[in-house]
Regions:
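Beta-rich, blade/repeat-based domains predominating
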Residues: 29, 61-77, 108-123, 151-168, ...
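Structural signal for beta-propeller blades
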Residues: 42-45, 88-90, 132-134, 177-179, ...
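An edge-strand/N-cap motif at the start of beta-rich repeat modules
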Residues: 26-53
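Blade-level signature of beta-propeller repeat domains, shared across WD40, Kelch, NHL, RCC1
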Residues: 305-351
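Conserved beta-strand positions in repeat-built beta-propeller and related beta-rich domains
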Residues: 36-40, 82-86, 126-130, 171-175, ...
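Short loop/turn segments immediately following beta-strands, especially the blade-tip
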Residues: 49-53, 93-100, 136-144, 180-190, ...
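Aromatic- and glycine-enriched pocket-lining scaffold segments that form the walls
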Residues: 126-136, 144-186, 192-194
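Beta-propeller fold detector
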Residues: 54-62, 101-109, 143-153, 190-199, ...
Length: 351
């Protein structure tokens, strides 16, 4: 197993310039770009190829500082959104005509400090510490004015992640709420946030989620569980067994991968119907605590931090869900790298 280590210092990150609907549908797409953000002040979007070579380092023109979140970066049809927690806005980037180079398109103000973003129904959804809001997306960019907002049930700063399912949003608040918000026919947020039913009695820190169609898989991190939410109700809950605090999720066809922070690992589950079955307790291990995970076109990207440095690990995923480590990028002196997405070749062409 070959792993090439690329080391970047915190000071180098600041000066590096440009170098020489459901996301889980199966296709012939190939991975093109792997993205993460420094989450520093100022914040920077880092763009790599699947081999871990730095292609671009782009200022978001905002400030980072988010923690305890999931989905800090989102992508859809060549657009990429990045949360800037410290400056209460979201940077939106657009792929150029070659489908491989990003440029800043919009800086969208948020109602409060943003923690998570998602695309769907021609909208950008921004989850902040107290609310969720929708912004219309067009080829010209993202409307800076929200066309819908809803206050979270707790609105206590514990918001974790937002995801899009059929006709609504699913949201986590770490203060033990899994909630939904309805969308209009055009995709705008409408009405109030509602607590989903049948949440396990031992609920403790809902955090990350992954969505597909009408299903949302949600981690209940400190209860060591993963739940399936459908139609405003929890249908199934599965324990993570030997691995503790599953916090972040990524879907790959029949496989669901969880990043387990204190266990320094990724687990693999088989998911179908209402079933969540642990297939491999430990599919991969890391030097630090994982802080996010993403899948795209046969690649899995995982961010981790060991308290001194952050790392981006890029795995190949075979048809059986087995992970083979390809490259590891080390961010020397950068401890809070946040968010990861993988841009595929078909997304680059969907301009």
């Amino acid at each position: 197993m070959l792993a090439r280590i690329v080391t970047l210092s915190a000071s180098a990150l600041a000066i590096i310039g440009t170098a020489a609907n459901p996301a889980n549908a199966q296709s012939h797409a190939t991975p093109e770009l792997v993205l993460t953000a420094t989450n520093a002040s100022p914040n920077t979007l880092l763009v790599y190829d699947p081999s871990g070579n730095l292609l671009q380092s782009i200022a978001t023109h905002g400030h980072g500082g988010v923690s305890g979140n999931a989905g800090g970066i989102a992508k859809h049809r060549g657009q990429v959104a990045v949360v800037n927690f410290g400056s209460s806005d979201v940077s939106v980037f657009d792929l150029g005509t070659d489908g491989r180079r990003l440029h800043l398109q919009d800086l969208v103000p948020a109602v409060s400090n943003p923690v998570s973003v998602a695309f769907g129904y021609n909208h950008l959804y921004i989850l902040s510490t107290t609310s969720v809001e929708s912004h219309w997306v067009s080829p010209a960019g993202v409307d800076p004015q929200p066309d819908g907002t809803a206050t979270l049930l707790h609105a206590d700063g514990s918001a974790g992640q937002v995801g899009v399912v059929t006709g609504q949003l699913v949201i986590t608040e770490k203060s033990n709420a899994i909630e939904s918000v309805a969308l209009t026919a055009d995709g705008a947020v409408t009405g109030n946030a509602n607590l989903v039913s049948d949440i396990p009695a031992n609920v403790n820190t809902p955090l990350g989620l992954a969505t597909r169609g009408n299903d949302a898989y949600v981690t209940i991190a400190h209860a060591n569980e993963i739940s399936l939410v459908r139609d405003d109700a929890v249908l199934t809950t599965t324990p993570s067994v030997t691995q503790h605090a599953p916090c972040w999720l990524a879907l790959d066809g029949p496989f669901l991968f969880s990043a387990n922070s204190p266990s320094l690992s990724v687990s693999r589950y088989a998911v179908y119907g209402q079933h969540i079955i642990q297939d491999a307790a430990v599919a991969a291990t890391f030097e630090g605590d994982p802080t996010d995970i993403a899948y795209g076109a046969g690649r899995l990207g995982v961010i981790d931090s060991d308290g001194t440095n952050s790392h981006l690990s890029i795995f190949k995923v075979d048809e059986d869900g087995n992970l083979t480590l390809g490259d590891v990028v080390t961010f020397t002196g950068v401890v809070s790298t946040n968010g990861v997405v993988i841009i595929t070749s078909d997304e680059g062409l969907a301009r």
